[in-house]
A protein has these predicted regions:
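Surface-exposed, flexible coil segments in extracellular/virion-facing regions
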Residues: 332-358
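Short, surface-exposed loop/turn segments at beta-strand-coil junctions that are enriched for proline
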Residues: 358-364
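Extracellular interdomain linker/stem segments of modular secreted and single-pass surface proteins
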Residues: 391-397
Length: 397
């Protein structure tokens, strides 16, 4: 449902056969399950492109779908992405690679480069990678330099109710009145009907935050895990001494009067589930009968250098909605995402789309983050964001 948001270089089905007792899909091979889902997606594609023409065709995705552990197809798919002339980082999202599955295709690809091409080429290709994944990469994780440039571990640590992986379903399953049968499996086309509740863990959602971290909502920045996103917010793994850019779910947010790790995800739960609901509607409804997210625009630069005591005005009056729905504007300081530790900054507003505040004392090492959440009055109500970052005056060099 989010294939329109990224350029998908490949899909790897890494489990040869579904686990008995856990997944009761009539197709038993991993690659067979993935292909059946893609065929269902293909049936929905004519509707989906009415809502966003960036949705890739079923054929394009099938051409880039391989089974892990079969020859070198999966590793070669990874290497093709790393060797492309496209200068953008390559994000590798890995889940389900544990007991009973094939080794990670990324590990196999890096094994090949390390053993056959030398240290310089290994370092060059590894520098292109960004990871949102559990650790399935063997010696490439900690032992073979250089480090991965950025790694977001959506699995650990265990605290406040278990592994972070296990908190997603608990925090989001019914957020905003979401109902998996009504909103996904019934009346939403062949892809929704295949949503895998046919397991012994209905609505198993621990892996979703792996890619939700990358959904471009206007709030998140993939290179900054500490800023927060629909996948949660992450902190640097301290016991490694900061030697490697490894982030995990060890941080907490203040929300509704308490401070908890769960809040880094719970605060967005209704918005992300409503977004999923809307996309299932897109599978069956024409553009004019479905809702689409607002287009948030704040005048000026997203990152600004300000002087202490300076009066700052923020203007989002250029924000629009595809259906011309009424819009609500919520402005707030996000203290945990920034590094400013001084007195609270108060935002003042005489109209919903504008706020003013007085810049606090900031230096080059401190940031103040202000987030704007805009929600439309459609069904389901959809939310998008803008993040404004304020830093102290630039030093003269």
């Amino acid at each position: 449902m989010y294939a329109n948001e990224w350029d998908i270089e490949g899909i790897i089905a890494n489990r040869p056969v579904a686990r008995e007792g856990e997944n009761t899909h009539r197709e038993r091979t991993g690659i067979g399950i993935v292909r059946s889902l893609l065929r269902a997606y293909g049936e929905c594609h004519p509707q989906l492109v009415q809502h966003d023409p960036r949705y890739p065709t079923m054929e394009a995705l099938l051409q880039r779908t391989v089974a892990g552990g079969v020859g070198n197809a999966a590793a070669e798919l990874v290497l093709a992405a790393l060797e492309s002339k496209d200068p953008r980082p390559v994000w590798f999202l890995n889940w389900g690679t544990d007991y009973g599955s094939n080794p990670s295709a990324l590990k196999l690809a890096l094994d090949q480069v390390h053993d056959q091409r030398g240290a310089a080429e290994y370092a060059r290709l590894k520098s292109r990678l960004r990871l949102s994944s559990d650790d399935r990469f063997g010696e490439h994780t900690w032992d073979v330099p250089p480090a991965f440039p950025l790694w977001v571990d959506t699995f650990r640590p265990e605290r406040e109710g278990g592994r972070w992986y296990h908190r997603f379903s608990a925090l989001t399953a019914t957020a905003g009145g979401f109902d998996i049968e009504r909103d996904v499996r019934t009346g939403h086309g062949p892809l929704g009907a295949m949503y895998p509740v046919n397991t012994d863990r209905p609505q198993k959602e621990g892996d979703s935050m792996t890619f939700l971290y990358l959904v471009p909502t206007g709030m998140n920045h993939p290179e900054h895990p500490g800023w927060g996103s629909w996948g949660g917010r992450y902190g640097l793994r301290e016991e490694k001494g900061g030697s490697r850019p490894y982030y995990w779910a060890n941080v907490a947010d203040a929300w509704h009067g308490t401070v908890k790790r769960d809040h880094v995800l719970a605060r967005w739960a209704v918005a992300l589930q409503n977004d999923f609901k809307a996309r299932l509607d897109w599978c069956v409804a024409p553009f004019e009968q479905a809702n689409h997210p607002p287009l948030v625009t704040v005048a000026g630069e997203a990152i600004r250098h300000v002087k202490p005591g300076e009066r700052i005005g923020l203007d989002a009056t250029a924000t629009t909605d595809p259906e011309s729905d009424a819009l609500s504007f919520e402005w707030y300081v996000y203290p945990e995402a920034g590094s400013y530790e001084g007195p609270p900054v108060e935002l003042h507003s005489s109209e919903p789309a504008r706020v003013v505040f007085t810049a606090p004392e900031l230096d080059e090492t401190r940031e103040l983050h202000v987030v704007l959440a805009v929600t439309d009055a459609g069904e389901p109500a959809l939310t998008r964001y803008a993040r404004l970052i304020f830093r102290g005056p630039q030093a003269d060099h």
